[in-house]
Amino acid sequence: MAARRKARKRALDLLYEADQKAVSGGAPASGDAVALLAERIATPHGEAPMREYTVEIVEGVAAHQARIDELLETYAQGWSLERMPAVDRAILRIGVWELLFNDDVPDAVAVDEAVALAAELSTDDSPTFVNGLLGQLLRLAPVLRDEEAAAGG
């Protein structure tokens, strides 16, 4: 497994765990993800060292989560964030962050990696759902990036 794919999977684990803790405890998920990341870096409990790209993903998703969630709510036809499987929600947050806020990842790679994570870790229908939603955002990416630049994001 490529280094970035491993980093994405680890970031997915952290975002998913933070999301689940937020659902059960009522705390904001983005703050929990960064706090959970810091905790794991400080006390790794036998885990491999945290990859730099894992840190970048978690911090990036947390920094832009309000906008990412707004886009997901807007373009996920017939689905609210709460109704989506939690794994899909985390995968989509990573995918949207890579598409719109990370210039180092080619757009097609961001979509393909998100679909691969969905195929590996979620429901049978998830890869199609993730591909369709990220594909729609990919088509809108130039406009969305311009909006982010104009807003200072």
Curated annotation (Swiss-Prot):
One GO process term, biological-process aspect: transcription antitermination
InterPro entries to which the protein is assigned, alphabetical: NusB-like_sf, NusB_fam, NusB_RsmB_TIM44
TM region(s), chain numbering: none
Record-level Gene Ontology MF annotations: RNA binding
A Pfam family recorded for this sequence: NusB
GO CC term (a single one): cytosol
KW RNA-binding (keyword) present: yes
Keywords carried by this UniProt record: RNA-binding, Transcription, Transcription antitermination, Transcription regulation
RNA-binding recorded as keyword: yes
SUPFAM superfamilies: NusB-like (SSF48013)
Source taxon at top rank: Bacteria
Function: Involved in transcription antitermination. Required for transcription of ribosomal RNA (rRNA) genes. Binds specifically to the boxA antiterminator sequence of the ribosomal RNA (rrn) operons.
PANTHER family with a match to the protein in the record: ANTITERMINATION NUSB DOMAIN-CONTAINING PROTEIN, N UTILIZATION SUBSTANCE PROTEIN B-RELATED
Family statement drawn from the similarity comment of this UniProt entry: Belongs to the NusB family.
Protein name according to UniProt: Transcription antitermination protein NusB
Organism: Beutenbergia cavernae (strain ATCC BAA-8 / DSM 12333 / CCUG 43141 / JCM 11478 / NBRC 16432 / NCIMB 13614 / HKI 0122)
Taxonomic classification: Bacteria, Bacillati, Actinomycetota, Actinomycetes, Micrococcales
